[in-house]
């Protein structure tokens, strides 16, 4: 029988596991509020597009019936205030950088960013141009990089699955 939950570290985990086993037989589930919030956050990513060039076409294709991104619990949103994931796809210019930062700042916490394509990752083909930002990670913090020029819809889908896996594993990402 369990003695109490006032123990620390590994002893507390063992006590919690023992209590969970006892309650499972009676139809109860023991978990933490943080685990429930992370489970809900992982299964309901609301993303907004920041399509700047040809990668945006592949990003749109991911929402079509062949790939159907919504079956993974993600849904597109038009407003940054309703989304927690921003997908930056395409060439980011110096004139567009302040707009990207402004949209990012309007998103509620926790917020995630996927950089899609060579241009968003590091400037791509236009890397040496005077008007191109050499990677959107210079403007906003990026969680997942999707390589390619342009990356396929499968690559973006894999990037979103990796982000969900990362959220599930670590909870809220620490920056």
Curated annotation (Swiss-Prot):
Keyword annotations from UniProtKB, A to Z: 4Fe-4S, Cell inner membrane, Cell membrane, Iron, Iron-sulfur, Membrane, Metal-binding, NAD, Quinone, Translocase, Transport, Ubiquinone
Documented EC number(s): 7.1.1.-
Coiled coil segments of this chain: none
SUPFAM superfamilies: HydA/Nqo6-like
Needed co-factor(s): [4Fe-4S] cluster
Places the protein is found: Cell inner membrane
Cofactor note: Binds 1 [4Fe-4S] cluster.
Any one biological process term the GO annotation gives: aerobic respiration
Residues engaged in binding [4Fe-4S] cluster: 54-55, 119, 149
Record-level Gene Ontology MF annotations: 4 iron, 4 sulfur cluster binding; iron ion binding; NADH dehydrogenase (ubiquinone) activity; NADH:ubiquinone reductase (non-electrogenic) activity; quinone binding
One GO CC term, this protein: respiratory chain complex I
Membrane topology of the entry: Peripheral membrane protein
Catalytic activity annotation: a quinone + NADH + 5 H(+)(in) = a quinol + NAD(+) + 4 H(+)(out)
PANTHER family: NADH DEHYDROGENASE, NADH DEHYDROGENASE [UBIQUINONE] IRON-SULFUR PROTEIN 7, MITOCHONDRIAL
Subunit-structure text: NDH-1 is composed of at least 14 different subunits, Nqo1 to Nqo14. The complex has a L-shaped structure, with the hydrophobic arm (subunits Nqo7, Nqo8, Nqo10 to Nqo14) embedded in the inner membrane and the hydrophilic peripheral arm (subunits Nqo1 to Nqo6, Nqo9) protruding into the bacterial cytoplasm. The hydrophilic domain contains all the redox centers. NADH-quinone oxidoreductase forms a supercomplex with ubiquinol-cytochrome c reductase complex (complex III or cytochrome b-c1 complex) and cytochrome c oxidase (complex IV), which stabilizes the NADH-quinone oxidoreductase complex.
Protein name, entry field: NADH-quinone oxidoreductase subunit B
Species: Paracoccus denitrificans (strain Pd 1222)
Gene (UniProt): nuoB
């Amino acid at each position: 029988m369990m003695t109490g939950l006032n123990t620390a570290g590994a002893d507390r985990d063992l006590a919690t596991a023992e209590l969970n086993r006892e309650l499972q037989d009676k139809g109860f589930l023991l978990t933490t509020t943080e685990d429930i919030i992370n489970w809900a956050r992982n299964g309901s990513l609301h993303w907004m597009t920041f399509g700047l060039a040809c990668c945006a076409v592949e990003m749109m294709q991911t929402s079509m019936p062949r790939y159907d991104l919504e079956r993974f619990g993600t849904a597109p949103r038009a407003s940054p205030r309703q989304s927690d994931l921003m997908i930056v796809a395409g060439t980011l210019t110096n004139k567009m950088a302040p707009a990207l930062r402004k949209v990012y700042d309007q998103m509620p916490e926790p917020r995630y960013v996927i950089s899609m394509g060579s241009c968003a990752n590091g400037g791509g083909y236009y890397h040496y141009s005077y008007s191109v930002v050499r990677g959107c990670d210079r403007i906003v913090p990026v969680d997942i990089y999707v390589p390619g020029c342009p990356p396929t819809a499968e690559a973006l889908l894999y990037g979103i699955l990796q982000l969900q896996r990362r959220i599930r594993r670590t909870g809220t990402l620490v920056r």
